[in-house]
Amino acid sequence: VTSEHGCMVDVQGIGVMVRGDSGSGKRECVLGLIERGASLVADDIIKYRAIEGRELIGMSPVTGRFHMEVRGIGIINVPAIFGVASMRVEKRLDLVVSLKATDKIDNIERVGIRKKKYEILGIKVPHVELPVAAGRDMASLVEVAALDQKLKSFGHDSAIEFEAKLLKTISEKGIN
């Protein structure tokens, strides 16, 4: 068992850990996801346990379960505000999303061919770094990243499929 700093939500069946520096907008992002129908698993501290060395299960410490700290508001009881569907006791971790200032990302991914991983307890989990900027709807971007991961779990990788179509078009038309 280990702990990680961040927030964890269930986005349409995909367990997502949202992480980032203090003040990066993690909680605002997670609140936006909950408003869209996601379920809170953990806020601030996520406890992970490995299952057979191949998957991670995340949960909240009992003392903070179903609560979030929101700057300027304080501690909120998520299911009391958003309903019982907004909470989840535990969830498998499928995706890690790091919210980062644009200048702190070495190479911002534009196509999706390079696959990053985040390791916890020796298990590597798909990892996406999203640049944070004023006016960006981070909840929407995290939701899209989660749904893209869901597609990948069914064998559909948008970036690889796009590259294959592009290469086929180039070879058929002789475009250099």
Model-identified regions with their sequence ranges:
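A generic local secondary-structure boundary/capping motif
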Residues: 5-8, 29, 83-87
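Solvent-exposed alpha-helical segments within well-ordered globular domains of core cellular machineries
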Residues: 7, 31-32, 140, 144
